[in-house]
């Protein structure tokens, strides 16, 4: 047996091998040591010849899913080695083979998956400066593919990875030359990475694989060789690990990168689209506010919409019109919501059905979901909007599938499919006949017992059963002399003897044969039903997709109706004009407390950049985030929290909000900040929306202000970028840019001050702030009064150009320039010479920033 184990393990070196022995999956040697640690199992041993004892641990086969899930969640692969023949019928060693390799990206079991999230596996391949990229969720059958070209391909690639957030990544080709990619995956994604050999991406082989899988759709990708290569490599990997066909994956969704708004990792994190930055919880995120879906399919699609805002006006308007129709019809909206609540996860149910792992309970769940389809169809029959009409036409009532399952499968079937009890009486005449014989067994045995008592005259004769001897006749010792010669003794006990007769063995054969025939017949009937349902995959899949879309639209309509959201005017202009905008998440968290609304007016002509000044804690960051969130909501087709809104299509949103040391990569707060700013400057376009919060605060005052101004100038200049920008800063000196730069306007957070007390009014008003109110904010934060008083004294001295050194009693000169270390050491300094040779009037903002760094390095 151990030789068999070694042979199979040799072929699966990169996996933890679950080796079936009886009722357990056993692990040996290093696998056992690893599993015992990760799963907290007792490590034992097994003799394996030549005085060697192999480390061993195991888990019961009937409860293995939980253990496998824990290993896969930690990034391990698990190879399932099953007994492929009945041990009772085996001649010699039981045959065993790998039936499946479970990896983080190939999980299908519902108990191992989050119903609200897709579980993607990704494959990427690069050749000739072109990247092929695909994502597949094997549990739902979804497959997305794209091709990335151009100088910004790395940025596009990481944005795609962020949006799909795969659990497992397969890479090959020139992708390995992207040195920063492994760092990104390790820091930003919870995904395992596997390098595939070059031959896995062989174009001719991959072409054959893709053609065989998608005969009718191959033409959509045939001219994109890198896409064909990643699809072929991924499909081959899935076949190798799943040991089965991939009938569930029957459609390629090819998309272009310019179909969706670009959202990089920092933007998705800073806007807290699906989880909060601090706790990583759903509560407090935009998804938490918008996701009132009733089905698992809807929950996954809602998340996908948030991560892929649209750029197509028609598609956006179609979604909006559907939401508007439901908002305006309360009764329809409530009825649809209630009906959706009864629909199970059709997508993942169908995956288990197609791959033959579904049990009778899964079929009943599908039946229960289908039962609601006629009502949903009837509710939508008179809808007017294009989107709801499309959904209505896409919903197949599947009445034949419902009738089949409902007539065949009992209401509450057992979990297992190999012990009978699944098929309804009346569904199959042969089964009813066999089951009748089996159910009458007690009556038959009672009659035999009565007959034998009459024949023998033994009053306490009994007919019983055990697994060893089958049916037997039991006679107590006091009546042994009355036993007929036709009785064959089988067992002697202390107080009785047990016998069999030929007639009893014949009856036993009929009874036990009926049980076996019944179980086998039930399984065959169940399997026929399952296959019939599987054969209707495309019909059911199309309906499931329609239900998911209806669920998301209805959820957004419910949120809009409950929170007084309005339909924004999304158009092709360059304007973002919102009246009385509110932050949807903050408003939801405040519950009954009022949220102070604010306006915004940006466009590419006269109002490109809004400089926002004001004290910390006053609401600058909240305001900027809410504008970005409202734009994003508008482009997924949602209504928005405002009294009116005009949104010109934005191709990307970039955010630079807050920073912290990146200890893992050895980057300081300032380095992280500058890296993010560099990414924005490199990848933003004139159609982007930029949210820049406190640029330059991670370094000294002069350096920080210089960098902030340079970035501001670059964003405002239409020849260089000209993007719509919200620019919050504590450098009040930058407010002068309103007079110096075209398209720049000043705004501040209104503050009401009475004596030493301040009140943040949370209103955005025109003009720059005249005070940072830092000491007042410190007071609000709970800084001790003694520290506050001392701070006021120091501030007063600084404002008069003085600072009293109490230890040395030295008073500095009244020269405000001395409050910062001079960049210029002396008249002979090389810094002076460098400055003399520089024409500052011709410097670009970025050149000025580079010069600043050079000067700093010369000091």
Where are these regions (language model features)?
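Amphipathic alpha-helical transducer elements in NTP-driven molecular machines
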Residues: 2, 18, 29, 58-68, ...
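Short flexible coil/turn linkers enriched for glycine and charged/polar residues
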Residues: 12-13, 72-74, 115-117, 127-130, ...
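Conserved catalytic alpha/beta cores of large enzymes that bind or transform nucleotide phosphates
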Residues: 161, 166-174, 180, 195, ...
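Amphipathic heptad-repeat alpha-helical coiled-coil/stalk segments that mediate oligomerization
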Residues: 198-209, 261-262, 277, 368-447, ...
């Amino acid at each position: 047996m151990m030789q068999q184990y070694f042979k199979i393990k040799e072929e699966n070196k990169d996996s933890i091998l679950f080796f079936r022995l009886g009722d357990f999956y056993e692990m040996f040697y290093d696998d056992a040591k690893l599993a015992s640690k990760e799963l907290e199992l007792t490590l034992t041993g097994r003799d394996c010849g030549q005085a060697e004892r192999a480390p061993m641990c195991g888990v019961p086969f009937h409860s293995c899913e939980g253990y496998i899930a824990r290993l896969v969640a930690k990034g391990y692969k698990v190879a399932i080695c099953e007994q492929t023949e009945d041990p009772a019928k085996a001649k010699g060693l039981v045959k065993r083979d790998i039936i499946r390799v479970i990896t983080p990206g190939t999980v299908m079991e519902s108990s191992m998956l989050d119903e609200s999230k897709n579980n993607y596996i990704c494959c990427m391949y690069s050749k000739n400066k072109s990247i092929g990229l695909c994502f597949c969720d094997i549990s739902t059958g979804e497959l997305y593919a794209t091709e990335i070209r151009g100088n910004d391909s790395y940025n596009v690639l990481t944005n795609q990875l962020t949006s799909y957030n795969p659990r497992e990544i397969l890479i090959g080709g020139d992708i390995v030359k992207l040195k920063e990619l492994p760092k990104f995956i390790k820091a930003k994604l919870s995904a395992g990475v596997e390098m595939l050999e070059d031959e896995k991406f062989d174009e001719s082989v991959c072409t054959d694989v893709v053609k065989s899988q998608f005969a009718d759709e191959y033409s959509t990708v045939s001219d994109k060789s890198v896409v064909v290569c990643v699809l072929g490599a991924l499909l081959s990997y899935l076949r190798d690990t799943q040991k089965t066909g991939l009938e569930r994956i029957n459609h390629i969704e090819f998309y272009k990168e310019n179909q969706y708004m670009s959202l990089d990792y920092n933007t998705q994190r800073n806007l807290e689209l699906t989880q909060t930055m601090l706790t990583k919880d759903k509560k407090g995120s935009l998804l938490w506010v918008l996701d009132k879906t009733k089905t698992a399919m809807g929950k996954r699609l809602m998340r996908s919409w948030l991560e892929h805002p649209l750029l197509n006006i028609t598609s956006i308007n179609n979604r909006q019109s559907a939401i508007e129709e439901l908002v305006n019809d309360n009764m329809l909206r409530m009825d649809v919501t209630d009906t959706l609540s009864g629909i199970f996860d059709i997508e993942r149910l169908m995956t288990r059905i197609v791959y033959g792992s579904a049990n009778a309970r899964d079929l009943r769940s599908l039946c229960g979901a289908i039962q609601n389809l006629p009502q949903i169809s009837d509710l939508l029959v008179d809808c007017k909007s294009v989107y709801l009409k499309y959904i209505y036409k896409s919903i197949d009532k599947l009445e034949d599938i419902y009738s089949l399952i409902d007539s065949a499968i009992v209401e509450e079937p057992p979990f297992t499919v190999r012990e009978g009890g699944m098929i309804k009486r009346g569904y199959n005449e042969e089964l009813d006949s066999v089951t009748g014989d089996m159910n009458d067994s007690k009556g038959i045995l009672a009659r035999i017992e009565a007959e034998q008592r009459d024949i023998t005259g033994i009053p306490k004769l009994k007919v019983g059963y055990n697994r060893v001897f089958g049916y037997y006749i039991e006679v107590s010792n006091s009546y042994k002399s009355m036993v007929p010669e036709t009785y064959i003794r089988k067992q002697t006990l202390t107080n009785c003897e047990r016998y069999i007769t030929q007639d009893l063995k014949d009856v036993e054969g009929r009874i036990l044969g009926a049980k076996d025939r019944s179980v086998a017949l039930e399984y065959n009937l169940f399997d026929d039903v399952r296959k019939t349902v599987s054969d209707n995959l495309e019909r059911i899949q199309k309906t499931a997709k329609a239900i998911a879309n209806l669920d998301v639209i209805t959820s957004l309509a419910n949120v809009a109706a409950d929170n007084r959201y309005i339909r924004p005017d999304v158009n092709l202009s360059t304007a973002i004009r919102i009246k009385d905008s509110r932050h949807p998440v903050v408003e939801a968290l405040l519950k009954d407390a009022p949220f102070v609304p604010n306006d915004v007016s940006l466009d590419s002509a006269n109002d490109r950049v809004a400089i926002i000044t004001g004290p910390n804690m006053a609401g600058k960051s909240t305001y900027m985030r809410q504008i970005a969130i409202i734009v994003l909501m508008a482009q997924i087709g949602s209504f928005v929290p405002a009294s009116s809104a005009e949104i010109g299509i934005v191709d990307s949103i970039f955010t630079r909000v807050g920073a912290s040391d990146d200890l893992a990569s050895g980057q300081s707060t300032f380095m992280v900040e500058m890296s993010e700013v560099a990414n924005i400057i490199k990848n933003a376009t004139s159609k982007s929306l930029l949210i820049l919060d406190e640029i330059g605060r991670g370094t000294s005052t002069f350096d920080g202000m210089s960098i902030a101004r340079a970035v501001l100038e670059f964003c405002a200049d239409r020849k260089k970028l000209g993007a719509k920008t919200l620019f919050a800063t504590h450098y009040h000196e930058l407010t002068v840019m309103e007079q110096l730069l075209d398209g720049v306007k000043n705004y501040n957070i209104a503050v009401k001050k009475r004596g030493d007390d301040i009140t943040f009014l949370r209103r955005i008003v025109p003009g720059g702030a005249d005070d940072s109110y830092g000491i007042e904010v410190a007071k609000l934060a709970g800084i001790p009064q003694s520290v506050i008083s001392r701070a006021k004294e120091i501030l007063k001295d600084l404002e008069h150009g003085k600072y009293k050194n109490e230890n040395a009693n030295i008073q500095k000169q009244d020269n405000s320039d001395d409050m910062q270390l001079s960049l210029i050491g002396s008249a002979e300094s090389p810094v002076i010479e460098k400055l003399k040779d520089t024409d500052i009037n011709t410097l670009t903002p970025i050149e000025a920033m580079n010069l600043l760094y050079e000067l700093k390095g010369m000091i």
